[in-house]
Structures are given as structure tokens and as C-alpha cells.
Swiss-Prot record:
Biological process terms in GO annotation: positive regulation of DNA replication; protein secretion; protein transport to vacuole involved in ubiquitin-dependent protein catabolic process via the multivesicular body sorting pathway
Domain UBA: 409-448
Gene that produces this protein: DDI1
Name of protein: DNA damage-inducible protein 1
EC number from the UniProt entry: 3.4.23.-
Biased composition (Polar residues): 146-167, 378-388
GO cellular component, one term: plasma membrane
Species the sequence originates in: Debaryomyces hansenii (strain ATCC 36239 / CBS 767 / BCRC 21394 / JCM 1990 / NBRC 0083 / IGC 2968)
InterPro entries according to UniProt: DDI1_N (IPR033882), Peptidase_aspartic_DDI1-type (IPR019103), Peptidase_aspartic_dom_sf (IPR021109), UBA (IPR015940), UBA-like_sf (IPR009060), Ubiquitin-like_dom (IPR000626), Ubiquitin-like_domsf (IPR029071)
Top-level enzyme category: hydrolase
Amino acid sequence: MRLTISNESNNQILSVDISESMTLEDFQAYIQAEFDISPQDQSLKHNGKPLSGSDKSLEDLGLNNDDLVLLGKTSVGSTTASSGSSVTANSNNSNAVDFQIEAMRTQFLSNPQLNSQLRQSNPQLHSTLNNPSEFKNSVIGSLQQFQNGATPGSYNPQQQEQLSRLQDNPDDPESQSRILEMIRQERIDENMQLAYEIAPESFTSVNMLYINIKVNGVLVQAFVDSGAQSTIISPKLADKCGISRLIDRRFVGEARGVGSQKIEGKIHSVPIAIGDSDTHIPCSFIVIDTHVDLLFGLDMLRRHKCVLDLERDVLVVGGNIETKFLHESEIQANPFLPGVAGSSASAGGTGGTFGGQGIALGSNSAENNNVTSSIVPANSTPDTTKQKAPNAAANAAVKRQDTGNSSSKFSESDIKQLVSLGFSKQEAIFALEQSQGNVEVAASLLFQ
């Protein structure tokens, strides 16, 4: 038969299918398993009458299908024991809270980033870090305020008064807009509070990735930026490393990212050593006068099959060279620290574009034929460089018309040499035009 058991202490209801021949003693044992109440503490009532007689079957006690049995507690000793258990549980909970608060205090003391964040967000609590008892009292006080509703998302009396006035005239569009704005701000504050609790590290600054690199034997610190299209070096650092004489001024142009900066040229190949490795690998640089002396961009990361292993905090180059990313304290001049001015055109930019009818750094597609640019050939006159470049459509049309004539300027062997690298004849001729007939420079342009 089916019986419904209702626990009067917590209003819990349980429906069970049991046999009519089950004794009351077995029924009480079943209830103990379901409700965790011992048979001695059980008070069972059916139709307002207590059930008694542990050896009697439920059928003999008058229980029928779909009857209701009320379960209550009658033992005073049980109540006392329960109270004692409650006190013990509260004591254990208190000890657990104390342990968590002390662990949090220790974490704040051992983690400089969290310590700095606490100093900015809650100076009063930060001042108690070195005093465990004061810190505990402050945290408990904050928790009590939070439980009482004094959360960042709750309304202060002034806001509550304003909300009441707005609700007095709910049909006014301005009032509705203001109420929606207050609700939206409350949700934002709640979301921010949630982020504080589950991901406090998101409110601290993230260290940028720097590595040690030897350029022409000179040890420098390079900023690793997988979002930058090209590897960049400043003229000052190029001079310091003794490679400024290798700057090819024919690659003058403009780098466009968040802003724009002048490209002073390109260094085609310089041996560099990553970290403490003695293995040298070739590296090319775009020369830009920027606040980042050396930026290790995506072109070299791809070329040397680099892996940014953030779990181990290392840069893996070519599968066999590893170097640790520098700690913030090891970075000699960090331009990304607050208050350090710098250009926005280098780090994180999309690379540069060369001029005239030129091509974009990092691409060899046909669409580059339409890119407006400002390459200044070495033998150009000042008047020539001041002429305005035609628009993209005109450039493309002129180039298509002059392709046949341009091919006669260059030897067929030079064109075939570039075509054998996987490029079309038009791209090969176009690159030769930009490099003034220099096959090596043209190949470098096509591979960018």
C-alpha cells in the first residue's frame, strides 16, 4: 500500500510504497533511514491517534492505502542532544570560518598583487593585516553588513527615496527610463561583486611577456607580442647593437595600428640568441622609433615555430630552445607601467604598410596591389616624393595596363626566379618594380 509521511518539524513530505504486513517496528526503522530520526524520538500519528505496538502490522493498526502518517519528535532527551549537536556544529563552523579568515589574511600578506589591490579597494581592512584578531573582526563585520543587505548593489536611503518618487509616477517615460537605469546599475554592481569574489585577479594588472635576447652579441630585453604583425627594433637600440648600418632605407613607410608611426627602414637579417642559449637564429626587424626598444612579433614567432607556454611561463623556440618569461621586477624599463607615456602604434599594431603602389607588411596577396603607400626609393628626388599617390582603383588600373611594358624592364630570368618561389608573374614584376630590380629585396617583399 501507499502511505504519505509528513514530518512536522520541517514540513518534509515523503510518499512510500510498503507492505501491509510490515510491523510498526520495521516501519519506524524505515522512517529512521529516511528522516534520520531514531525510533525512540519518533511520534507517529494516524487520524490524530498515536501508533503503538511494535509487533503489530500496519494493517492491524488500521492503516489503509493513501493514508497520511504524521511524524513528530517527543523526546526531551533528543531535543537536548540535538541542541548539543547544534552547539557542536556551530563551534565547528566557527573554527572553520576562523581558519578561512586566517588563510585569507596569509594570502594577502604573501601575494603582492592581492595586497596592493586590498590597499586600494579597502584601506581600513588593509591596515589590520598584521593583526590577526583585528583582521578577523573587520571581516566578520563586513560579512554581517553583507548579510543585512548593505551590499554594493543595494540602495542607500537617498536612492531608495528617489526610487519611491519615481514609482509614484510609473507612467512617465522619464521615470521609467530612470528606474531601468537604476536597476541596470544594480545588476552591474552585483556582477562586479561576484567578480570580486570568484576572480579577484581580474582587477589587477597582468605582467607583459618579456624575454632576454642577444642581438649581435648585445643582451637586450624583448617584449613578446603575438598580436604585432612584425618584429620591431628602435633606431636607438639598433645603433647600440651595432646594426644600424644594415638599415635599408628603401623600406620607409608607415606603421598603422591604433595610431600610426613612421617606418625608418628594415634590417633584413641579424643573428639573435634566445635566453641563455648559444644557438643563433636569423631575425629581421622593422625599424620604428617607438617606446618599445625591441618587440618580438608574430612574423618571427611563426617563422621559428615558437610556443607561448603560459602554464610553465616559458617561450619555446623551435621545440628545443626554452627561456623563462621575465618577472616584473626583472624588467629594466617597462613602458606598460601606469604613468609611462608611449606610442600606441607599435605594440599590438597590425604592422606597417609600404608606400607608392606598394604592399602591406606581412602579406603577399594580390589585394596588396591596391594599398596606398609611401616607399621612397633611394634615387628619388624630393619633388617626386611630395607628389600625391593616386587612389587605389587608379593604381590597380595603371598597373594592369603597364604590366606588359614593365616586364620588359627586367630580365626574364629574374622574373622566373621569383615565379619559381610560388608567386604569380604579376606579383613578381610588381615586387621587382618596388625593389628597383633587386631580386633579393623583391623576394623579401613577397615573403613578408
